[in-house]
Amino acid sequence: MTHKNEARWTTVFNQYLREKKLYGFFELKHTVLEYLPFSKIEAVQYDGLQATAKSGLVWKLSDQDMREKPCDTLSIPPLPSYVVIKFIDGFYLIDITDIVKMREDGEIAISRSKAEQIAKKIIKVELKKKKDYEEE
């Protein structure tokens, strides 16, 4: 999947979050396969999502960013933390604790069918163009 397509799907997901007022911490992963290897989730992402679910987040917004910022620092309470997998048919919100348990049980990937069973939410999207789902 091209970076342009990844950026587009991230924009679509972020718009959904704004419209539906869905709150949490989200790490988006895109795949054109019927599964997502856990190796695509970096250690810092596993650690970060578990920490935000348990302790929340305090984050200093960068002064280097040229865009206007609403404030200097964010302090957010613990909220659900998800790995969001963009499969061909939609976004699957998988709680980080479920991903961690699967890894501890020896799993190396999550299939779309397994994601459908354990997802806290599934946001279906329409397939518009085949090129949206092709590998680079």
Task: Indicate where each model-derived feature is located.
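Mg2+/Mn2+-dependent nuclease catalytic core
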Residues: 31-55
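Nucleic-acid nuclease catalytic cores
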Residues: 50-101
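Active-site donor-binding loop signature of nucleotide-sugar glycosyltransferases
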Residues: 28-30, 96, 127-130
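Conserved catalytic cores of phosphodiester-cleaving nucleases, focusing on short active-site segments
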Residues: 19, 23-33
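Acidic-basic catalytic patches of nuclease active cores, encompassing PD-(D/E)XK
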Residues: 1-22, 134-136
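Charged phosphate-binding loop/patch that engages nucleotide di/tri-phosphates or the phosphate backbone
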Residues: 106-136
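Surface-exposed flexible segments
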Residues: 35, 40, 93-107
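Short connector loops at helix/strand junctions that flank enzyme active sites
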Residues: 23-25, 44, 76-78
